[in-house]
Design a protein with these regions (language model features):
Chain A
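Thiol-/selenol-based redox modules, centered on thioredoxin-like
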Residues: 135, 140-169
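Short, internal strand/loop/helix patches
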Residues: 103-139, 143
């Protein structure tokens, strides 16, 4: 009997492990993102090594994501010096389908951080690589590309960025 | 005893309130189409009498027509002109799937337009979370 319970427990636990494997974990390396920028040139996340990077997954069709863009802009401006010194960056990864909408929204909000997209909507491989179930979604990574935080927004996000940028100075 | 009466009244009030909230949606529960139903009709080629319209970011469902996000007035016009010569008895199902129903800016204006135009067999595809979780992850048929 004890053995059966033990076996059942192991089965349950392995199921849990398996489920966890499909999603991101803090402390793990962030999956590579290799996508084109708005002008069509290639870009890869690994080229940002050495910086704290906020990867913002968004789309112009996602109302809460669009609403968050001014907050990200404020964050980007607040840490403009860190950006200049190569310590901080924001990478916007759009799950848009329409290049026109994507471009227009970038212009409308005067988004001046990095923006990439393969314009494949939910079929973009990054959605799978990062296990994204819905937008908005973001990941904060450290200088080595390790995940520091998953899906933090607003004040919580800002405080963490602040903490990491200050510690590293 | 008083406590029970209070609880009873509170429950009644709340349930009335909750159903009142539901009534505010332009569709009735019976006007929701389940994804499994639509997916099996597509797979079995039984969609000839059915119009599948995307009123969101992308017409990803196989055989659907891309109207565009219905929170944009231009796309409501597009929906109007697309349906101008369609019989009011035609079975129509619309979907968006950008986000959960309560956050979606597209399904309400689109469904209201169908109602205003007098379509009697209009339905809304039941995508409570989004098109990713409720359609793509289930490997239902898509436009490629």
């Amino acid at each position: 009997m004890k053995r059966t319970i033990f076996l059942l427990l192991i089965m349950l636990f392995s199921g849990y492990l398996f489920a966890q494997n499909s999603t991101l974990k803090v402390g793990e390396n962030a999956p590579e993102i290799a996508l084109p920028k708005v002008d069509g040139t290639a870009f890869s996340l690994s080229s940002l090594k050495g910086r704290i990077v906020l990867i913002d997954f968004w789309a112009t069709w996602c109302a809460p994501c669009v609403k968050e863009q001014p907050e990200l802009k404020a964050l980007y401006e607040k840490y403009a010096n860190s950006v200049k010194n190569g310590k901080f960056e924001i990478l916007g990864v759009s799950l848009d389908k329409s290049k026109e909408n994507w471009q227009k929204t970038i212009e409308r909000f005067k988004i001046d951080w990095l923006q990439v997209s393969d314009l494949k909507f939910w079929k973009s491989p990054v959605a799978k690589d990062y296990g994204i179930e819905g937008l908005p979604f973001n990941v904060l990574i450290d200088e080595q590309g390790k995940i520091i935080a998953i899906n933090l927004h607003g004040k919580e996000l800002e405080e963490l960025v602040h903490k990491y940028l200050n510690v590293e100075k | 005893m008083r406590y029970f009466i209070f609880l009873f009244v509170a429950m009644l009030t709340f349930s009335n309130w909750a159903s009142a909230q539901q009534k505010q949606e332009p569709w009735a529960k019976s006007q929701l189409m389940e994804t499994a139903t639509l997916a099996s009709r597509i797979t079995n080629n039984k969609t000839k009498d059915l119009l599948i319209l995307s009123v969101g970011p992308d017409a990803i469902i196989k055989g659907s027509v891309d109207i565009g996000p219905a929170n944009n007035q231009e796309n409501i016009k597009k929906l109007n002109s697309y349906l101008k010569n369609v019989s009011k008895d035609k079975k129509i199902v619309i979907y968006c799937g950008c986000c959960p129903f309560d956050k979606c800016p597209n399904i309400r204006p689109a469904f209201n337009t169908l109602k205003e135009m007098g379509f009697k067999n209009a339905k809304l595809l039941n995508l409570p979370k989004n098109i990713k979780a409720d359609w793509l992850d289930k490997d239902y048929p898509t436009n490629d």
